[in-house]
Swiss-Prot record:
Zn(2+) binds at residues 413, 416, 431, 437. This is DNA ligase. Pfam families: BRCT (PF00533), DNA_ligase_aden (PF01653), DNA_ligase_OB (PF03120), HHH_2 (PF12826). GO terms for cellular component: cytosol. Keywords: DNA damage, DNA repair, DNA replication, Ligase, Magnesium, Manganese, Metal-binding, NAD, Zinc. GO terms for biological process: DNA repair; DNA replication. Its cofactor is Mg(2+); Mn(2+).
Length: 689
């Protein structure tokens, strides 16, 4: 990663665009697929790089910035549940200084002279949930989803042992929030069962819990050893108590499981002592934790602090350092992705780290092998922080055997044997043989049918590989003629190994169902390099319909300057991504394939809905000193209500809030005849919005 202090504005823009796409993909894999692609520590590093870039270049903040989002958009297989109060994620603290900064921000924001008590509790590594009770009866259970809309898992949550279905002496409407998890030993037992039944094993306890809870068949969920803790009252918590410690006491009285390991800290020293206690004893706990959560204990102060786009100001998560292990590097294999990128993967002697058996680790690129001087048969240090594929941190050179073997970077593609192309600025090696490369073609079809693309259930890795090997499909278009081909063939698919009448019927139904697709999903399904879900949405928003999209892309092939400029001006589409789009549509076969797909699919026009309020999109300027609230709190409230807060007055300004000692900005607002109100009027206004 580049040095943020030395980065230019142009480089920052490109990096922000890349980070937005990467983090969106990682969010989807983690929250929706229950299949994280990178370690927690690597994700945190990317996210913090994004934040630092935005702090240095605030004018470059993208519409699809990760700092504005929580989780990922929910899948289509569950009914949707809208959270009355968003289920946001927490900001992270990685060391004691970060925690001190968190405490200082509270003091400054609230204008406090003394330490405000902080409630400390373990950060459970599970799946967040919300449960709603009406007249004491459980009516709705939901996942976090994207923070605003989650998945309805009511039937599944009712199968969890000791989860209350009915409670007494509570308000007419009650919400609780918490974490659903699987204990370490239960996870090992579950994986043993999966292995004995020939099913894929779960990567870690969190994945197992998430996968179990997101089953369409609740009888499967009922067989899984799920447990839970509640830690919040959601929209109703302030009807139950005035502080976090009182709330947990009340929820326990109602019959909910709460985590008894907690601490109400009265100083920074007490915070750090509790953190060290948990860090030292985490391996002795029956469940996985990945840090400690700190919250302002007082709900009145929490309300005043409020939220930023994706997290509350009044809470943070102090993360534990990653778990380190050591094992032997047995070999290095190479994978070819759908865009031709070659990725080396370390094959390891299996090792258990934090209750999970690890046998593979990502090496990211071939330069990393040389930089770390990795050799086959070396003993390597492995880092795991709740991830699926951990990261190799380095070599134990003191234990290096005499018979180690260096790894030779391939010159030819392992799939199609074509000469490889090396791109120094991307630090990657690529096969440019496109769809003539079997590995790329396979991965492209796999991407096309994936959940967040065309979402064709029943076409997993094994099924796609089988259909290609049998010559039944060779490109995405063939999928939609599979039933027709099967009906006219003597060798029926349902009679072949691994298939059956029911599975084939379901597959054909799912293929037919997928023909109705939104424009953003369709664009994403095409597999254009660097066009993830967010950038696909940007393109869909710009062009509106499939017909306009394909027409404009054909113009792009003819070097039409207007369309080039239009794409170049899109926030989130930089020069690098634009080149990738041009390269994709320069291939005649790609245009032909898209047109044929457009002829058989119902591709819905792009639609976007936005909630409106009286302050939405209004430009507000604060000037002078405010007596009852801090400037930061006033700004946060305005943004929460949809306003855009500016630092200077211009003809575009809609409202000026003038405090004591307002000067030049107030004068200019009067000259421009802009509406001006004082602090008291502002407080009345926001109360009534």
């Amino acid at each position: 990663m580049q040095n943020i202090d030395l980065i230019s504005e142009e480089e920052a823009q490109k990096l922000l665009e890349e980070l937005a796409d990467k983090i969106a993909a990682y969010n989807h894999a983690y929250y929706i697929e229950d299949n994280p692609l990178v370690s927690d520590s690597e994700y945190d590093q990317l996210f913090n790089t994004n934040l630092k870039l935005e702090q240095k270049f605030p004018h470059l903040i993208l519409e699809n910035s990760p700092s504005k989002k929580v989780g990922a958009k929910i899948a289509n297989k569950f009914a949707k549940v809208t959270h009355q109060v968003p289920m946001l994620s927490l900001s992270n603290a990685f060391d004691e200084q970060d925690v001190r900064d968190f405490v200082d921000r509270i003091k400054i924001f609230l204008r406090l002279n003394e330490f405000a008590p902080i409630f400390c509790e373990p950060k459970i590594d599970g799946l967040s949930f919300s449960a709603v009770y009406k007249h004491g009866v459980l009516t709705t259970g939901a996942t976090r989803g994207d923070g605003y809309v989650g998945e309805d898992i009511t039937a599944n949550i009712k199968t969890i042992k000791n989860f209350p279905h009915k409670i007494d002496n509570v308000p007419e409407f009650l919400e609780v929030r918490g974490e659903i998890y699987i204990e370490k030993q239960d996870f090992l037992n579950l994986n043993k069962e999966q292995d004995e039944q020939g099913k894929d094993k779960f990567a870690n306890p969190r994945n197992a819990a998430a996968g179990s809870l997101r089953q369409l068949d609740s009888s499967i969920t009922a067989k899984r050893p799920l447990k839970y803790f509640v830690y919040s009252g959601g929209v109703t918590e302030q009807n139950l108590a005035s502080s976090q410690d009182q709330l947990l006491t009340k929820l326990k009285e109602c019959g909910f499981n709460i985590n008894e390991i907690s601490k109400l800290a009265s100083s920074e020293e007490e915070i750090f002592a509790f953190y060290e206690y948990l860090k030292t004893n985490r391996e002795n706990l029956p469940y996985e934790i990945d840090g400690v959560v700190y919250k302002l204990n007082d709900f009145v102060l929490q309300n005043r602090m409020g939220f930023i786009a994706r997290s509350p100001r009044f809470a943070t998560a102090h993360k534990f350092p990653a778990i380190i292990g050591q094992t032997k590097l047995l070999s290095i294999t190479v994978q070819v992705g759908r865009t031709g990128t070659l990725t080396p993967v370390a094959e390891l002697e299996p090792i258990e780290i934090g209750g999970v058996t690890v046998s593979r680790a990502t090496l990211h690129n071939f330069q990393e092998i040389a930089r770390k001087d990795l050799r086959i048969k070396d003993y390597v240090f492995l880092q795991r922080a709740g991830d699926v594929i951990p990261k190799i941190m380095g070599v134990d050179f003191d234990k290096r055997p005499n018979d180690t073997e260096t790894f030779d970077t391939p010159l030819f593609c392992l799939s199609c044997n074509s000469k490889l192309h090396y791109t120094p600025e991307d630090i990657i090696i690529r096969c440019d043989n496109g769809l003539n490369c079997p590995a790329q073609n396979y991965e492209r079809i796999r991407h096309f049918v994936s959940k967040n693309a065309m979402d064709i259930e029943g076409l997993g890795r094994k099924q796609v590989e089988f259909l290609i090997d049998k010559g039944l499909i060779s490109n995405p278009l063939d999928i939609f003629f599979l039933k027709e081909k099967n009906d006219s063939s003597l060798a029926k698919l349902e009679n072949m190994d691994g298939w059956g009448k029911k599975s084939v019927e379901n597959l054909f139904k799912n293929i037919e169902k997928s023909k109705n697709v939104s424009l953003p999903r369709f664009i994403y399904a095409l597999g254009i390099r660097h066009i993830g879900e967010q950038n696909a949405k940007l393109l869909a928003r710009e062009f509106g319909s499939y017909n306009n999209f394909i027409a404009q892309m054909e113009l792009l092939r003819t070097n039409e300057p207007d369309i080039y400029q239009k794409l170049n001006n899109l926030e989130g589409i930089g020069d690098k991504i634009l080149v990738d789009i041009i390269d994709f549509f320069d291939v005649k076969e790609n245009i032909e394939l898209i047109k044929k797909l457009g002829g058989i699919l119902n591709i819905e026009d792009y639609k976007e809905t936005r909630e409106q309020s009286s302050l939405t999109d209004k430009i507000v300027v604060f000037t002078g000193s405010l007596s009852t609230i801090s400037r930061a709190e006033a700004k946060a409230t305005a943004e929460k209500l949809g306003a855009k807060v500016a630092v200077g007055v211009s003809s575009n300004t809609d409202l000026v809030v003038a405090g004591v000692g307002a000067g030049s900005k107030l004068k200019k607002a009067k000259e421009l005849n802009i509406k001006i109100i004082d602090e008291e009027e502002w407080l009345t206004l926001i109360k009534n919005v």
